[in-house]
């Protein structure tokens, strides 16, 4: 066994004599764009802003743990002098991540780029540097795909009618949406994101009609930009009448096996999206199994870190990500560019596939044998550990039995 397999999971390869046919997902953007995005399988999510000065949750702590007026003025103190875009992107690359998504604007309305359409932005903080721009440049330099998070609600904007734990206003959604388009045009044309990750759809001022309007606007600016499904309010499926977007986004949970619609789970490495002092970190086993279970379900994992107030990602988070990257250096073949299945993921195992290979990932060993469902019409040629010895196996009409070696 190689390092990491003993206590985390086993990667077993079934070499088939017949290739399996995979259903093609229904998509709204060019097929090439979606395919390239889904093949990446693993990305970094970054939630960051002035709220790190308090160590509470971004957006949601406004008017809760932090009084709204105090929260809205944190930007004046925000001066993350140790921020280094290259270091962030390197941490993502060392983790084996293929793309990065930054919260350009979260629900608190603070913009991490020098927008011309709101004074509540990074250039009016003590820092006065274009966070989004520096990250976009660093991603391009290091070969990481750059993506942007943007919310459709803004509890700071007087034109938005609902202000969480603050004074509600009558608002002006026409002006709000017009300004949103201007901000999105800036982000798309200036930073060239491959994907836009929307949020904030649930409040009553936002409607599916607004979502469709924004989706069409984005496509008019750049038809190749991928958009997640949070512009609309119908999540029964991408083809539903009220659905808007190109891929599904389960949050803090792993999506189920879905061969017809692309999806990406967003999950935190700790308990909170934004940085929290002494937050509980997921174990390496949890991190790797979260990634593998996502791929086994035919989805991507957008794994979140929250940088600290000084601009650095916590050293222990960087180290945990690097450990994931070390595992992927050995077993990445079973993750990148694969499809989920053909077996439905269960508690003890999941599977991915590519060409004439099935990669079986063992999460929990329950004996010396692993019983897999039958594969009608498919004949197995051999079974072996991805980076190790062959396994004894048996196939008949009732299923496939793998003999697992004894563990030291």
Describe the predicted segments one by one.
Residues 1-26:
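Bacterial Sec-dependent N-terminal signal peptides
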Residues 24-408:
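Mature catalytic domains of secreted/periplasmic carbohydrate-active enzymes
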């Amino acid at each position: 066994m190689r390092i990491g397999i003993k206590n985390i999971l086993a990667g077993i390869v079934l070499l088939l004599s017949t290739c399996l046919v995979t259903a093609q997902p229904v998509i709204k953007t060019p097929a090439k764009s979606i395919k390239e995005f889904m093949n990446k399988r693993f990305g970094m999510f970054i939630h960051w802003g002035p709220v790190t000065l308090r160590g509470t949750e971004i957006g949601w702590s406004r008017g809760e743990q932090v009084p709204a007026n105090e929260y809205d003025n944190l930007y004046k103190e925000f001066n993350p002098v140790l921020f280094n875009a290259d270091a962030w992107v390197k941490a993502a690359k060392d983790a084996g991540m293929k793309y990065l998504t930054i919260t350009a604007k979260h629900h608190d309305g603070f913009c991490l780029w020098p927008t011309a359409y709101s004074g509540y932005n990074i250039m009016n903080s003590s820092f006065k540097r274009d966070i989004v721009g520096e990250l976009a440049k660093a991603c391009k330099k290091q070969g990481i795909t750059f993506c942007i998070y943007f919310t459709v609600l803004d509890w700071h904007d007087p034109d938005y009618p609902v202000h969480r734990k603050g004074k509600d206003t009558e608002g002006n959604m026409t002006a709000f949406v017009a300004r949103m388009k201007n901000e999105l045009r800036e982000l798309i044309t200036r930073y060239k994101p491959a994907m836009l990750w929307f949020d904030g759809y649930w409040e009553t001022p936002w409607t599916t009609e607004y979502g469709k309007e924004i989706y069409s606007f984005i496509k008019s600016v750049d038809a190749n930009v991928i958009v997640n499904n949070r512009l609309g309010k119908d999540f029964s499926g991408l083809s539903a009448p009220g659905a808007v977007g190109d891929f599904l986004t389960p949050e803090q949970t792993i999506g189920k096996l879905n061969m017809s619609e692309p999806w990406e789970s967003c999950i935190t490495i700790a308990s909170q999206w934004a940085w929290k002092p002494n937050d509980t970190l997921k174990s390496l086993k949890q991190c790797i199994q979260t990634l593998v279970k996502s791929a086994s379900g035919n989805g991507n994992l957008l794994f979140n870190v929250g940088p600290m107030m000084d601009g650095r990602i916590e050293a222990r988070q960087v180290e945990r990500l690097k450990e994931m990257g070390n595992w992927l250096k050995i077993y990445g073949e079973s993750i990148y560019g694969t499809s989920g299945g053909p077996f439905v993921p269960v508690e003890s195992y999941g599977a991915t596939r590519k060409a004439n290979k099935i990669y079986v990932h063992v999460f929990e060993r329950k004996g010396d044998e692993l019983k897999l469902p039958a594969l009608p019409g498919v004949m197995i040629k051999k079974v072996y550990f991805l980076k190790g010895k062959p396994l004894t196996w048996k196939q008949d009409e009732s299923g496939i039995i793998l003999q697992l070696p004894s563990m030291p």
